[in-house]
Amino acid sequence: LSERVPELKMYVIGETKSRSFNDMDLSLYKKESRIKFLGRVSDVQLVKLYSNACAFIFPSFYEGFGIPVLEAQACGCPVISSNTSSLPEVLLDSAILCEPTDIQGMAKSMVTLVKEENMRNEYIRKGFINVARFDWESSCKMISDKLKCFAIS
């Protein structure tokens, strides 16, 4: 990725004490000036990071719902996500979906989003449309409709 887009920087947000990072020697990456481990950030910082990012990569194996991908989309950030658990249903066609272990596929998708502005803008547009499905009014109506179906049965 650094060869194809040398100006690209990667910010890892969140705790690095999880088992996902257990077998990694993070000190090797901390020397790399293009990779920054930010740890937990405030909501204000998170919005700023999403808003200024080329893309948000979310390689999750297990995800209950996927709020981070919706947060990124709400900030106008294209999403590259796993094709596992609830994420395909939450994202539909508004994101690029990859196997969570397909690092090359994610890197290729990132290069595409950086180099092809029209495609990037299309994913931003689709992201805004997708997020609108999850506003409070729509969510309440969906729950109400489901409860009515159960009451009738």
Which residues does each predicted region cover?
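Carbohydrate transferase catalytic cores enriched for Leloir-type hexosyltransferases
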Residues: L1-S153
